[in-house]
Amino acid sequence: ATLRLDLDGEPLELHRPALPRLIVLGAGEHAAALCRLGAAAGFAVTVCDDWALLVTRERFPDAAELVVAAPHEYLENLDSPDARTAVCVLTHDERLDVPALRTALRMPVGFVGAMGARATVARRAMLLRSAGVTDAELSRLHSPLGLDLGGATPEETALSVIAEIVASRNSASARPLRDGHGSVRRRDASSDSCAVRSA
């Protein structure tokens, strides 16, 4: 986005990088919590579900985009997915999540995750392989989704998911900072900041 400013009579352009994208497939309670925390963490959140009764502005006031569609069909038509795009599958229905994951794992996105218990994860991996997903593609999948924070509520679960996405994006260990050495700032924050130049 570009914004023109006038500082001391001299026009400037303020260039703000586009927000990283978080695509949440499924519109249950965990999705609502993930949308809230994702938006607060600086993501442009899209929520997609094939059930229109769930995909409402009242339930997802912080979403940048609400989509009523089959998740895999939405992904197939996604505009400009890139390494700053994270896809999280929270549909809890293998008829939806298997085709969505098969599509997502073949896209140039930076993160693909799926919620589920370990038994669900194992069965889903079997179904994905049966659907033609290779072991190399399957190795990209973060599932069960989230870091082990010991939480139980949708909000605590969402926090663990956002933490895993950020750690993955930065190739970070996700260990406590007190167990590390050196600077706590691992990267140049200017990569996500605004750049100002004279017009």
Language-model features: locations:
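Adenosine-phosphate binding glycine-rich loop
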Residues: V109, M115-A199
